[in-house]
Amino acid sequence: MPVAKDNQFWDALMENKVAKKLIKKHKCKAKCENIDDLANRYEVSKQEVEKVFKIFQLMDDDGSGTISSSEVAKMLNELGIDVSPKVVQAVMRSSDVSGDGQIDFEEFLAAVTSKIKLSTVKADVQLMLSKIDNNPEKVISAEELVVAWSETVSTNITVKEACALIQQADTQGRGKATIHEFITMCQTV
């Protein structure tokens, strides 16, 4: 499934060991401009912007300032991930916001930071759900979700937002979702 491979690509790319290995392997000379602005806009540290920039440079073999589908394929291969055209298309589709067939640095940074944030949210949600009950078949209501969310996650949600999440997770149309359904829904995001 391309989406899973797309996530596998981003996860492998940002894994500390892989990133460090790739950065050591290639010497990056250019500096990222507007680090402060980008860090603020994408709500990440300056160090994270610099790290992502170095990885971007590694992928930009021709020095064009953009990453092409062939450069994505090459990086997928280096990461040991399936290099089928569908996987490359999934990565390009998830990142190329402008639709020009190339991924510029800001598009790359946006994709990476969204994956980092999503990973954090998923971990928070799983922790939150484990606090509700260890029984994956336990049914939770929107109200229970609001309480558990406020005790675990750094943001609050309203009952209306919780209802929308429950509705999305509820595979049987009963207005409630099991913890298993909720985790499954979170993993498919």
Curated annotation (Swiss-Prot):
CDD domains linked: EFh
Keywords of the record: Calcium, Coiled coil, Metal-binding, Repeat
Residues that, per the record, bind Ca(2+) 1: 60, 62, 64, 66, 71
Domain of life: Eukaryota
Listed Pfam families: EF-hand_7 (PF13499), EF-hand_8 (PF13833)
Alphabetized GO MF terms: calcium ion binding
Residues bound to Ca(2+) 3: 133, 135, 137, 144
Limits of the EF-hand domain: 47-82, 83-118, 120-155, 157-189
Gene3D superfamilies the record matches: EF-hand (1.10.238.10)
InterPro entries, per database record: Centrin_CML-like, EF-hand-dom_pair, EF_Hand_1_Ca_BS, EF_hand_dom
UniProt: Ca(2+) 2 binding residues: 96, 98, 100, 102, 107
Any coiled-coil regions, as ranges: 31-54
Name of the featured protein: Uncharacterized calcium-binding protein C50C3.5
Biological source species: Caenorhabditis elegans
